Amino acid sequence: MRISPSEAAMKLSLSPPPYADAPVVVLISGLGGSGSYWLPQLAVLVQEYQVVCYDQRGTGNNPDTLAEDYSIAQMAAELHQALVAAGIERYAVVGHALGALVGMQLALDYPASVTVLVSVNGWLRINAHTRRCFQVREQLLHSGGAQAWVEAQPLFLYPADWMAARAPRLEAEDALALAHFQGKNNLLRRLNALKRADFSHHADRIRCPVQIICASDDLLVPTACSSELHAALPDSQKMVMRYGGHACNVTDPETFNALLLNGLASLLHHREAAL
């Protein structure tokens, strides 16, 4: 992977195109903001696509102090600007949770650029259950700091049996997350942007084909959210994984990758046929 040479835009990590004019797929992670979230997908995606990963502004290798009114629209705009600066004007988007919200905003604001959208455990507007989960996590952050936030995070991401079988891995992930913690203020401003986002009155304007992937055992985002999203979009298909939790692409990459690869191939072909 190489780093985009643009100094004005966010740093992007781009894989070499596997062939001339290969489609571009942009991977957008959730609230954690790290491009490394998609490691279980990279090896299969780079065989067919030029893949773009990045750490979101205010996280990882794109450090910044975010404004109090930071928004999903700003996240979409700065990503699109970075892609254009890297010479990428048309791209498919795969977004997880917050990343799916950014993907929808991109599809609304830059319809000529977004060819296909894949929403993974996303939603139209935050569900009361999801809001409750984040309220608990915020209380942990305020009372116990970054360590409490990080240690509680796997409970919302992974199935219990998956975690129980991987205690050493989770300890290592906790240590890494603490070492690269985005900071309390940035985290809360990104979380507030997520909570304010509401696509319930705009989703019908998204014209690109959308693949919706959700997990039936997601503790953080009920599958009803994906059903509502599916009903609101003009052109979408929904796939439900029986197992995997909120981070189903990490816990069951074999099932997830098959759904993703088939969906991208089908929807990109569908898009080309419609042009």
Swiss-Prot record:
This is Putative carbamate hydrolase RutD. HAMAP family: RutD (MF_00832). Involved in pyrimidine catabolism. May facilitate the hydrolysis of carbamate, a reaction that can also occur spontaneously. It catalyses: carbamate + 2 H(+) = NH4(+) + CO2. Pfam families: Abhydrolase_1. Its EC number is 3.5.1.-. One of its GO terms (molecular function) is hydrolase activity, acting on carbon-nitrogen (but not peptide) bonds, in linear amides. Belongs to the AB hydrolase superfamily. Hydrolase RutD family. One of its GO terms (biological process) is nitrogen utilization. Keywords: Hydrolase. InterPro entries: AB_hydrolase_1, AB_hydrolase_fold, AB_hydrolase_sf, Pyrimidine_utilisation_RutD. It is an enzyme of class 3 (hydrolase). It comes from Escherichia coli (strain UTI89 / UPEC).
